[in-house]
Amino acid sequence: MVHVPTRGDVPVRLGPSIDNVPDHGPSKMSRNPYTDPIQFELERERVLNRSWILGGRSEQVSDTGDWLTVESHGETVVVVRQPDGSLSAFHNVCQHRGPAIVTEQTGCGAKRFTCPYHGWKYDLTGRVVAVPERMDFDPEHLAGLRSPEVAVDEWGGWVWVNLLGPDDAPSLASWIGDDIMTDLGQFRMEDMVLHDVLEWDVPVSYKAVVDGFNEIYHTAELHGVSPDWVKAARDTSFWMVNERNYMCFVPRHDQLDELAENWDHHRHAICHYVVFPNTVFNCNPEHIQVFHPIPIDVDRTRFLCWQIVYPGDRNDPEYARYFDKMEKHWAGLKRVVGEDISIYEQLARTKRSSAYREHILSSRECKLAHYHDTMARMIAD
């Protein structure tokens, strides 16, 4: 039987009694967050290096010695499953002369890792365990040497890393927040499996990609959604969870009657969760997309879209119906994301234009304003 997410004991998040737009108001903001290389360097140092960053699915590192690499904003990290079932993570940087220790994105059953340049060997926790012609080095330089540790944790079937390291990083639970962990947890992502991954190289800031998933104002023009959907979307509820994260719930226009009888947002709405700085969960009862724009440079982004589904036997009629519905919906969503990509290409044409100075935001683009205010506060700290 396919899992059907329901609200359960989670508080009502959507309905006529819910104040659906936070008191942020219309605003303006500079274009600098998208185009200024100095600000990007500050973000790397003060935001991205201190945040929990999505790395991949736990199922990619299910057995001892399985590993994946996490690449983001000029950093590269190796995550490895340990013999005791835990995960370790360390910078993917050879401590000899700097090349990447691991050259592939994923792998299985490693016993140790060998730098391809001079053959230095590392154990599964990142410690140097063998150095060719060791007698030619100062013993003090090699004593206890390791690639620096990175904090790593799992939640919802996802692997997360934090470059502050195990001693200094906040807990992943505190970063995501109880409200999102409880609400998003109703979907039981840890029981889902990877169905598809799409990847694009887009010539804009990763923040422009996040923005596209933080408002529904654009959907009528860009995606050509129906007037009924636009009307229903006016009842979207927005929830600022903490100083960083937020969630919103968009009524599904084809289930408005069901929703009016039972304000169960997990069953009758699109549930949308943003974990700062660059992870977006877009949840439907049938499947979940995770949008992950990875910053490469101030105006270049590696954009990943993960699709996860509930597992089952496709020979089972009930699961076959579920899978067919999911596949059709996924095909439509891929078209929608392609339309978003077309806008990023147009933004790339104008990002250096003298006529591009600022953004004018409506009250319903409050999540954009909140997101960039959060970024500015973290840079200032």
Sequence positions of predicted segments:
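Basic/polar N-terminal segments that are highly enriched at the extreme N-terminus
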Residues: M1-D19, A380-D381
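Short, contiguous pre-domain boundary segments
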Residues: P11-R31, E190
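Non-catalytic accessory segments flanking enzyme active sites
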Residues: M29, P33-S72
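Generic structural signal for secondary-structure transition and capping sites
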Residues: L48-W52, P99, H218
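Short Pro/Gly-enriched beta-strand edge/turn motifs at strand-loop
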Residues: R50-S62, V131-M135, H272-P277
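Short clusters of hydrophobic/aromatic residues that line enzyme substrate/ligand-binding pockets
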Residues: G55, I101, V128, Y356, ...
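Rieske [2Fe-2S] iron-sulfur-binding domain
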Residues: Q60-G165, A169-D179
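C-terminal catalytic domain of Rieske-type non-heme iron oxygenases
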Residues: V80, S86, N92, D153, ...
